[in-house]
Amino acid sequence: MESVEEKSKQRRWLPNFKALRLKVYRLADRLNIPLADAARVELEEYDGSDPQSLRGLQKLPRTLYFGLPLPDSELDDTGEAKRWFPRNKIRTAKYTPIDFIPKNIFLQFQNVANLFFLFLVILQSISIFGEQVNPGLAAVPLIVVVGITAVKDAIEDFRRTMLDIHLNNTPTLRLSHYQNPNIRTEYISYFRRFKKRISALFRVFLAKQEEKKRAKRLNDAVPLEDMAGSESRPSYDSIFRESFEAKRSFEDSKGKVPLSALDGTATILQSRPMDIIDYEAEATGECHFKKTYWKDVRVGDFVKVMDNDEIPADIVIINSSDPEGICYIETKNLDGETNLKMRHALTCGKNVVDEASCERCRFWIESEPPHANLYEYNGACKSFVHSEAGGSDTSQTVSEPISLDSMLLRGCVLRNTKWVIGVVVFTGDDTKIMLNSGAPPLKRSRITRNLNWNVYLNFIILFSMCFVCAVVEGIAWRGHSRSSYYFEFGSIGGSPAKDGVVTFFTGVILFQNLVPISLYISIEIVKTIQAIFIYFDKDMYYKKLKYACTPKSWNISDDLGQVEYIFSDKTGTLTQNVMEFKKCTINGVAYGEAFTEAMAGMAKREGKDTEELTLQKQSFIERDRMQMISQMRNMHDNKYLVDDNLTFISSQFVHDLAGKAGEEQSLACYEFFLALALCHSVVADRVGDRIVYKAQSPDEAALVGTARDVGFVFLDQRRDIMVTRALGETQRFKLMDTIEFSSARKRMSVIVKGPDNRYVLICKGADSIIFERLEPNEQVELRKTTSEHLRIFALEGLRTLCIAKRELTEEEYYEWKEKYDIAASAIENREEQIEEVADLIESHLTLLGGTAIEDRLQEGVPDSIALLAQAGIKLWVLTGDKMETAINIGFSCNLLDAGMDMIKFDVDQEVSTPELEVILADYLYRYFGLSGSVEELEAAKKDHDTPSGSHALVIDGSVLKRVLDGPMRTKFLLLCKRCKAVLCCRVSPAQKADVVQLVRESLEVMTLAIGDGANDVAMIQKADIGVGIVGEEGRAAAMSADYAIGQFRFLSKLVLVHGRWDYNRVAEMVNNFFYKSVVWTFTLFWYQIYNNFDANYLFDYTYVMLFNLIFSSLPVIVMGVYDQDVNADLSLRIPQLYKRGILQLNSARKIFIGYMLDGFYQSVICFFFSFLVINNVTTAAQNGRDTMAVQDLGVYVAAPTIMVVDTYVILNQSNWDVFSIGLWALSCLTFWFWTGVYSQSLYTYEFYKSASRIFRTPNFWAVLCGTIVSCLFPKFLFMTTQKLFWPYDVDIIRESYRTKRLHELDEEEEIENAEQSPDWASSTLQVPFNASSSSLATPKKEPLRLDTNSLTLTSSMPRSFTPSYTPSFLEGSPVFSDEILNRGEYMPHRGSISSSEQPLRP
């Protein structure tokens, strides 16, 4: 029987032999290669499918021991810890220097096109198939494409590798010589030892080099005054240098922290029942906080983080330099939020202040398994408490719950705190930042997905051509009536059937260009440059945050031009998310004066003069504000009030607070605002004489800030003591417990103990949540009055909350507290257990009142929504606000108008599901005459028009949940499809994602979701395109999105300009790419007619190799990057041009087939024109050689073919300027240059000096010109006819722009605007009302409206100009004038007539 030592030794050697084998098993499993049963079992054991495996244990809750030995249940048979924890060394790079080449090549050849071309290279290396071609030369195109991609991947990965190295070698403080029982004995393989030696030598070498550089810098020192203002960006070399210098500095100091680092430590207090220090244990004195690298930190280690240092791993806070155990962190690296957040140390660790106390700690932590939720952590810290009772020493286990409030996550930065001592619970890939760093859902653009169909079609054509060649060639060899039977040495294969097979594969090699090898890399290059253009668009740069529109996914820019549905959050997306407390209701009395944007919108709909009404309201509010401030100053001197920042205006409130309306109302006002000053989680920060509140929610900051302004000031919080000053009187409340807010609970509660020793629970939340928790049969009239006030507030566009309280006895509290502590200490399902316990105490509440907060619209939102609607895009708003609030915001932002028929889908919970389905069916039939059948849904998929009616649907979240979960999805979707606007209110993040998924999958349309908060991430990732706004709630949405912008108004240009351009560019580019491949390949096919279809080359092989790679790629790439039919201004002024993208007219398959047929026709001309002309003429060079040799014929055919292809591409471009024409000329010249230079080489054999012979003959130039004209004239004639008699919308707009008619329209509009009365302001496209200004904002230039019914170009404002078009739009205006080319103006748009789009007729 093996000893424990032998087993331990065997286990240490185990990784050395199994590591490689397991990697092979994993690779085979990913490739779906069947594994043997033994291999499958071994893989599952070490990969975690088996719960008892090393990695499987990692997925279970973990228990970590500190100063205590591991129990037997945590040990294996060798005495080692069962658990395996990942190293803290992380790697975000895809490759290492060793595996880059094989891994990158393996990933690239997962692309089917690359595999196909690799197959061709292998075929050509076999002499029977590729005897005419050098295999090395045949591999050049594939090597170039793979090489370019590899270089691009290497550049991208190099940066990640450098950042990984820098991060892993960041120094931190770890308790050295501490016996950590949680870590298994680590086996270091020979390879890792080798790497460590190499790294050590590398560091020594760099250190010596740095010493030389430092000495040289000292010798060549520059005076300080000469260096003033000089600043350089850090390089990777400087990053390494700083890392190695830091290492040397702390190694020179033996890694010990100087005593000065412990200045300001917390005073050691007397031991209490919950204390993790064993004061009877003796410290060895060998443990010190020694500097080490992040990569060496392990689970179970004590670490010490200093001020402004980054957190190396996920750690539980044991103590901090603050006497109350408070520390502050910045979480910008995790969620993008820059405001500081407060964290609290465990109360049981308040005496842990130095190395000795850490060494004497005796406790264990029960932790949940690692997961990616950044906002949740459940754990418990437990230890033994010894007590002497009845003369015997007994031990009792005590516990303290651990939540996220006591955690520091890797990536956060410690701020405003001298030091923090903590213990590591998660390292490396188990940390939350790494679990959240996984790649977002892979999104491929629609054109890219549809590209497979084009490729498959070309494969079918390719194999058909090869099959024809194989059959005909086999038949030809079988017959004896041809001269080849007598002059050839026999068939290659030995029989007609084998000859056919050989010819088939030789044909695959010959016609390979039909599947363009450079297509995918060209598309990737084009989309990368398009993303760069988007990023550098100054019109989408948000100056306030210094943030440009940032593409995160570079491969879906063309999808932006096909969006049909936009799903938008409201708060922070349409609004500013800057909350202003405007009104409140207290004890049935409403307070506050305000004139909101929604109120202005209602006045406008009622036909009132909003300008005059605004002046009246503002004048009244200003007088009331001055009166209120004067009354408050007389009541008490509030030094924290800044007069200009006061948003809650109500002199009546101060009057009632002073008791002039009775003692009852005065007490109610006092309790209401004192509750606001206590029920929160904000941090008070003193800035001079002012107090500024930092909160995770802008609503909470507004509530506490208004309480401060009216005299109820929250001063500070130390541990569990909240200090307030109410009307000048300082009070201290003990915070007993906080029940946090969550999106599921929709409420928050605190329990405080007042100066009079009374226990009070204060609860704030949504009105529907609070009202159902009030004391039954109490405050009946107050409930009705408050509900009416809240309804009015919501109609005014304000966000509402309710405040309530409950007084508790000490017995009630501690009875509940016992249950709450059990729930709070639970490792699993803690949230659900806390919710159950919270329901016990958050009941029988007494209503105090309600608040109303205004969230103003962002600048430009109404204009942007109007533009998107005119473009044919449907906008749905998904918000968590009340229905009334959402409706009024909808009116304010032009989503709704007074003429709409509102369908409010809000029913009681008592209504059963069958009854709800009847109601939904009634709505659908009554308004639209539909039954909700599957056939109607299929018809709806093909209908992309804007709903013709004037209906708007508003649905509540509770009803929406039942609709989405039941069989009513089809009826609901049809109802929404027929409505011009849809508002979903009171919805959860999951419901937002479900709505997006329903529309996207059921209607098969392009969807875009836009939001600004973490609750929008699910919706953003579910949509085809996700757009995140960098806002007040952090950058969680922006980090998860495909595009990040600063304001909603930038969305209109992103979609209507860049999206439309990129869609047109990519669609046209793909069609032209396949067109040129067809032209080139079929010229080779026609040659086979005169060659027994034996798959011989017409061209020199270099032509075949370079055609798609060099000769014809540049014009197509320029088209994909640079082309635009109209400029950005016209794209925004005439948003109806966007509808072609929604209908996918430019990427329709019939358009693709048209290009293929055009290429087929041109291939006939290119080959037969040259062949038939030359075949009937005998020509000879000066040396007497007949120039009709096959290589010379190849030049005769290749030259016009390449010229035709390049000219055809630029003819399809809409925008001609010096740049595009220059690149077109460069592409053409490469052919002439290559032919002239390459044919001078002796190694070209029969091709030797072909250029010098052929280019001297006039026949060649006659054939060249004739072929180009014959190929392109039908296309030019078709384009001219289409634009003259069946012009598209864009053709009319471009012609109007060219003939200055749009400029004349602008001038007439300006004249009419000056003469126009204010009545026109009722237009839905007017500039949004700004209540803060003294008058209505000046209207901007109106977008043009293209009326396709009357087929005239009209403006949205009254005018007398209506252009009429003669049969010749371009009469008297040359198409290709030098002036236009020099200015880079736009050429008339090319296109083809589509039956799906009704062309505009004169």
Swiss-Prot record:
| The family this protein is said to belong to | Belongs to the cation transport ATPase (P-type) (TC 3.A.3) family. Type IV subfamily.
Keyword Cell membrane carried by entry: yes
Active site, per annotation = 569 (4-aspartylphosphate intermediate)
Q: Which gene encodes it?
A: dnf2
Top EC class per UniProt? Answer: translocase
Query: How is this protein positioned relative to the membrane?
Result: Multi-pass membrane protein
Q: Which UniProt keywords are listed?
A: ATP-binding, Cell membrane, Endoplasmic reticulum, Lipid transport, Magnesium, Membrane, Metal-binding, Nucleotide-binding, Phosphoprotein, Translocase, Transmembrane, Transmembrane helix, Transport
GO biological process, alphabetically ordered: glycolipid translocation; phospholipid translocation
Q: Which organism is it from?
A: Schizosaccharomyces pombe (strain 972 / ATCC 24843)
One cellular-component annotation, GO: plasma membrane
Q: Which EC number(s) are documented for this chain?
A: 7.6.2.1
Binding, a 1,2-diacyl-sn-glycero-3-phospho-L-serine: 1275
Q: Where in or outside the cell?
A: Cell membrane; Endoplasmic reticulum membrane
- This protein's name: Phospholipid-transporting ATPase dnf2
Q: Indicate the transmembrane segments per the record.
A: 109-129, 135-155, 457-477, 501-521, 1066-1086, 1101-1121, 1151-1171, 1193-1213, 1218-1238, 1260-1280
Task: Read off the InterPro entries from this record.
Answer: ATPase_P-typ_cyto_dom_N, ATPase_P-typ_P_site, ATPase_P-typ_TM_dom_sf, ATPase_P-typ_transduc_dom_A_sf, HAD-like_sf, HAD_sf, P-type_ATPase_IV, P-type_ATPase_N
Q: Where is this site: Involved in the release of the transported lipid into the cytosolic leaflet?
A: 517
Q: What is its main location?
A: membrane
